[in-house]
UniProtKB/Swiss-Prot annotation:
<feature type="compositionally biased region" description="Low complexity">
    <location>
        <begin position="137"/>
        <end position="147"/>
    </location>
</feature>
<keyword id="KW-1133">Transmembrane helix</keyword>
<keyword id="KW-0812">Transmembrane</keyword>
<dbReference type="GO" id="GO:0016020">
    <property type="term" value="C:membrane"/>
</dbReference>
<feature type="transmembrane region" description="Helical">
    <location>
        <begin position="358"/>
        <end position="376"/>
    </location>
</feature>
<feature type="region of interest" description="Disordered">
    <location>
        <begin position="164"/>
        <end position="222"/>
    </location>
</feature>
<comment type="similarity">
    <text>Belongs to the IIV-6 067R family.</text>
</comment>
<feature type="compositionally biased region" description="Polar residues">
    <location>
        <begin position="104"/>
        <end position="121"/>
    </location>
</feature>
<feature type="region of interest" description="Disordered">
    <location>
        <begin position="401"/>
        <end position="451"/>
    </location>
</feature>
<feature type="region of interest" description="Disordered">
    <location>
        <begin position="89"/>
        <end position="150"/>
    </location>
</feature>
<feature type="compositionally biased region" description="Basic and acidic residues">
    <location>
        <begin position="175"/>
        <end position="222"/>
    </location>
</feature>
<feature type="compositionally biased region" description="Low complexity">
    <location>
        <begin position="403"/>
        <end position="414"/>
    </location>
</feature>
<protein>
    <recommendedName>
        <fullName>Uncharacterized protein 004R</fullName>
    </recommendedName>
</protein>
<keyword id="KW-0472">Membrane</keyword>
Length: 451
């Protein structure tokens, strides 16, 4: 019998595809513009570097004759101590590990090699460039740790660079690199990858349009700041602005109570102060012009009365002239509005104090009342009633739901209403009258008698 626990082993072999499929490596090009100014907190950015494109700048090569002096914190006695670093020996004197196939990897002169320093590896002290004719300086066998680390990184970069050059034409690449470096001796030598990107952009193979810088965007769309940033930067100014808003809200409330029929916009503490102020000034200007037009209408009516009286005494038949002109007052409306806009003066600029204007208005209304009574006695025309109808004072009061009229609170009529004598109630209480006989009771009594 076969054993119960049979273990079966499977061998899996990887079979190549019948068609040689190319291996595609995704390439993600670097973005030329990241717009970091729109993402980071601007208070942490140097104002001089705001909206400036970042260009990586390499440290200049220090000659071997110069010495690097690094400042050290002061000693106990307060004197500054400077440490002088000796020149670093030439890199060519350091033995370079030979690659696996030295025949296929051509040697490249030191001038043709260009390397990019990584941001995470910054060798310190800096590598000092020496002249070709000068022999390597003798240095102690014990080297700092930073120099040894730098040389290791240098060797790895050189070996990777050899591999890249070995795949193409070594001599052509070397000559192009030498000529390029000799052409720009004072500038920093660029890396092969950077050179390839630059040549690609110059030849126009990269058809993608470069994004605009942040300066061009702000010129086109404007520099709109977020209003929620640094709201309490100036707290006293914000507090004063809130006080002005409360004052304007109170003024708007008074305007609604004084002019209930006028549509006045509503505002809150979250509204803009400048918008509230402009709206209040424009609303007050419109109401002031309307009030001035009404005053001019009263002046016109007073002039019509004077013309009727004067021309009537001369011999002209002027009876009903004031009434007829008052009914056609709408013809004067346009000219009166234009005159009111022309003579508009803000209350803060008005030279006459409010007390004098109040007394003048009272005298003017008294004069109109007296002249209207005089004309009413002579012509039997109630001009005062016409004036009240014209001014809108005799409109029927609005009745609320509970049955009471709105009265003076609604702004439709005066609290003092003139009541004629014929309609006045008697102050003496009426005598009580006896209740008469009921018709139904008499009929019921007669029917009982007949029965």
């Amino acid at each position: 019998m076969p054993p119960k626990n049979n273990q079966i082993t499977y061998n899996i072999f990887k079979v190549d595809h019948r068609f040689a499929l190319p291996r595609v490596r995704p390439k993600f090009p670097k973005f030329s513009e990241l717009y970091l100014e729109l993402l980071v907190n601007r208070s942490k950015v140097d104002p001089q570097l705001m909206n400036e494109p970042y260009v990586h700048r390499y440290d200049p090569v220090v000659s071997s004759g110069e010495s690097m002096v690094n400042p050290v914190p002061p000693a106990d006695d307060g004197r500054m101590v400077a440490t002088t670093l000796k020149a670093v020996p030439r890199l060519s004197s350091v033995p370079n590990p030979s690659p696996a196939k030295p025949t296929q990897k051509p040697t490249i002169s030191r001038e043709s090699f260009v390397w990019e320093s990584s941001a995470s590896i910054d060798p310190s002290p800096r590598v000092q460039k020496k002249s070709r004719g000068r022999p390597a300086s003798s240095t102690p066998s014990i080297e700092p740790e930073s120099i040894s680390r730098y040389r290791q990184v240098k060797r790895s970069i050189i070996s990777s660079y050899y591999k890249q050059v070995g795949e193409g034409a070594p001599s052509t690449t070397r000559r192009a690199a030498d000529s390029e470096n000799e052409r720009r001796p004072s500038e920093v030598r660029e890396a092969p990858e950077s050179r390839r990107r630059r040549e690609t952009s110059e030849t126009g193979s990269d058809k993608s349009k470069a994004p605009p810088p942040i300066k061009e965007i702000k010129k086109t769309f404007g520099n709109e700041e977020n209003p929620l940033i640094n709201v309490f930067e100036d707290y006293p100014q914000a507090k004063d602005e809130d006080d002005h808003k409360r004052e304007l809200l109170f003024k708007f409330k008074r305007l609604r109570q004084t002019y209930p029929k006028v549509d006045i916009p509503d505002f809150t503490m979250l509204s803009n102060h400048e918008t509230m102020k402009r709206t209040y000034d424009s609303t007050l200007r419109n109401l002031s012009i309307d009030s001035t037009v009404e005053n001019y209408k009263s002046y016109l009516m007073m002039g019509f009365m004077a013309c009727e009286m004067v021309l009537g005494k001369i011999g002209f038949d002027m009876e009903g002239y004031t009434q007829q002109q008052t009914l056609h007052m709408n013809k004067y409306e346009k000219l009166l509005v234009e005159l009111g806009e022309k003579s508009y003066v803000p209350n803060s600029v008005n030279k006459w104090p409010v007390e004098v204007r109040l007394i003048g208005l009272m005298l003017f209304q008294t004069t109109i009342f007296i002249i209207s009574k005089i004309i009413a006695k002579k012509t039997n025309v109630n001009l005062l009633q016409i004036y009240n109808n014209f001014s809108g004072l005799n409109e029927p009061p609005k009745v609320t739901r509970n049955g009471s009229s709105s009265g003076f609170a609604s702004g439709t009529s005066s609290p003092l209403v003139f009541i004629p004598r014929t309609k006045r109630p008697s102050l003496v209480p009426s005598e009580k009258k006896m209740r008469g006989p009921s018709v139904t009771r008499d009929l019921a009594a007669e029917q009982e008698r007949d029965a």
